[in-house]
Structures are given as C-alpha cells and as structure tokens.
Amino acid sequence: MAGPQRKSVNKKKVVPIKTVHIGAVDYKDTALLRKFISERGKIRARRVTGLSVQDQRKVAIAIKNARELALLPYASTAR
C-alpha cells in the first residue's frame, strides 16, 4: 500500500544577504529587514530564510531594535 516514491531534489538556497552584498545588517535598513518578516509581523525562521546561524541572529537583533524605535511594527493586523 505504499505510494510512489518521490525523488528528492537538492536545490541550493539563495541567501538574501549575500545576494544584496551587504556587509552588516543595519536596523535602519527597513526594506531589507521586511524580507525577513512575515505578513503577520513575525520573524521568519532560519529554515525559511536560508540564513546561517550568525546571520539569523544579526537579523533578529536588527528587527528587534527597529521595532523598539518604531521603524517596524510589532504585529500586523492584516486579515
């Protein structure tokens, strides 16, 4: 009763920070930070963004700093 087996296709993930050629993540760069936030306002997971552990940590800290300064919303009310 087993279904057909699927072949796994290994695609190389594109790291958004590397494609933009940014040395450091800045909390003032809201256009870049919005790529890592869901439409609900949550920080996207590392497995979704494709970032390394260090880069994900830098992005998360930058998003939190931008939220503190009201550059980014804490949560969205989109329904």
From Swiss-Prot:
Domain of life: Bacteria
TM stretches of this protein: none
GO BP: translation
Protein's UniProt keywords contain rRNA-binding: yes
SUPFAM superfamilies: Ribosomal protein S18
GO MF entries: small ribosomal subunit rRNA binding; structural constituent of ribosome
Keyword annotations of the record: Ribonucleoprotein, Ribosomal protein, RNA-binding, rRNA-binding
GO CC, alphabetical: cytosolic small ribosomal subunit
InterPro entries in UniProt: Ribosomal_bS18 (IPR001648), Ribosomal_bS18_CS (IPR018275), Ribosomal_bS18_sf (IPR036870)
PROSITE patterns assigned: RIBOSOMAL_S18 (PS00057)
Gene3D superfamilies documented for this protein: Ribosomal protein S18 (4.10.640.10)
NCBIfam families to which the protein is assigned, alphabetical: S18
UniProt function note: Binds as a heterodimer with protein bS6 to the central domain of the 16S rRNA, where it helps stabilize the platform of the 30S subunit.
Family according to the record: Belongs to the bacterial ribosomal protein bS18 family.
UniProt subunit comment: Part of the 30S ribosomal subunit. Forms a tight heterodimer with protein bS6.
Protein name listed in UniProt: Small ribosomal subunit protein bS18
